[in-house]
Amino acid sequence: VIVNKPADLLSVPGRGEDKQDCVWRRVQQSFPTARIVHRLDYATSGLMVLALNADSHRLLSKEFQERRTQKSYQAVVYGTLIEETGEVTEPLRCDWDNRPLQIVDYEYGKNAHTRWKKLRDEPNGSRVQLTPITGRSHQLRVHMQFLGHPIIGDRFYAPDDAQALSHRLRLHAEQLGFNHPVSGDWQDFTAPVPF
């Protein structure tokens, strides 16, 4: 099952009664056997795939783990990017004292790799396509912050003036491609960017 997750919705339930509404529970209302394959941050909108049975879940999870999927995101970052394309390979780890924040850590961080491409300049920033090669928590958000261009509306990593420019995080999972777990055929999906 492919869904276009809205911003400000959990992928899976959290702790507490107020954190039970999520993509997984909503999909289960129509597809009771649905299983989460991957997640998007609460503030991120865009494409997710859920498996409908254990075999499909295993196969799709393996594709994500082995990096055989294709994912691209669109974002609006704060400030004008000078370069047209680039890569960020700074290693990331959880900032345990400030969870759920992540930080760059060259000693203990895990390998993280993001490619980016400027699409156009916009007022207060640049619109970019982001391609995560790895899938670390908050990877795109921290890598863009590392470049000095945090994502507009990011309540975790952007300065106050960049947060004030949008009521939501300007990050959207626009494209998702993977091999269908039954047919093996390549599937490619896109979701319109809502900002």
Task: Walk through the language-model features, giving the residues of each.
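Pseudouridine synthases involved in rRNA/tRNA modification
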Residues: P6-S11, K110, S137-F195
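Short alpha-helix boundary/capping motifs
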Residues: E17, T134-G135
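RNA pseudouridine synthases
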Residues: V1-H113, R120-P123, R170, F195
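Loop/turn elements at beta-strand to alpha-helix junctions within RNA-recognition modules
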Residues: A54, I133-T134
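Short histidine-centered loop motifs in beta-beta connectors
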Residues: V128-T131
